[in-house]
Amino acid sequence: MKSGVTTVVDAGTTGALDIGKFYEDTKKYKTNVYALINIAKQGITSQDELSSMMNIDEYELKRAVKKYKDFVVGIKARMSKSVVISNDVEPLKVAKRIKNELNLPMMVHFGSSPPTIEDIFDYMEKGDILTHIYNGKPNGILRGNEVKKEIIEARERGIILDVGHGTESFSMDIAMKSKDAGIFPDTISTDIYIKNRINGPVYNLSTTMEKFIYMGYSLEDIIDKVTKNAADAISLKNKGLIKEGYDADLTIFDVVNEEKELQDSLNKSVITSTSIKPRAVVVNGEYLNIGKSIGENE
């Protein structure tokens, strides 16, 4: 909230065994918090949470979703070699069946292969979310300098493309090539945690938004991608719009002309002339100052 974000969604840190503790921890904050539950029962206690299929406990997963139905907004499956080891797409097959039984959206993380992005798409459906789309790894959205036809087909099938910046998952060059090809992200997200919040390259949502301004996206389009589109992707019916009947969650910010260095996950740096400075938020109807307005000493 202090960085101008009124609602956050944790993308799979916890699984069925520890999501209850996470839920209780969120109650101490004014920020609205929701979660995608990891299909691995232990969540991300290590980077290879799906190296054993025994880590998927369908009964406990469904029980946790039912118990925390107003908190869990979808399920998360991390599909990269370091996570699944030798299991390839087998965890994703299970995740697809479970998410259909629960009628929840599914977010899929992809990185190094196997599984390949082509194989991953075989188990994704309309309304599912692919994150880290600009990750810069060989198993990415480009084939040479062209966007893979599978990505174009996925968009046509209604699969949601999410940025998921993260420490290692955002290449500005790939993002620009994708934009030039007419393939745009549906949602812009940070994949933020303590390391990339303090040391970069993420820092906060505003900085991620500034990168898309630098790449030529309009501020209005960017705002849609971090508000309305994001809320729609996980069916948060009362979020994402300034409209009667919606929650009174707002961010007040200044857009100022000043030079600032921006860095992607591959150490590419650019200088932008546009900076977003959150000044205040309204969370559940409560107004809170978080910064100084234009004209005041910074």
Predicted feature descriptions by range:
Residues 6-7, 74, 129, 187, ...:
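Residues at the N-termini of beta-strands
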Residues 173-255:
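His/Asp/Glu-enriched, well-ordered alpha-helical/loop segment
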Residues 247-297:
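C-terminal cap of metal-dependent C-N hydrolases
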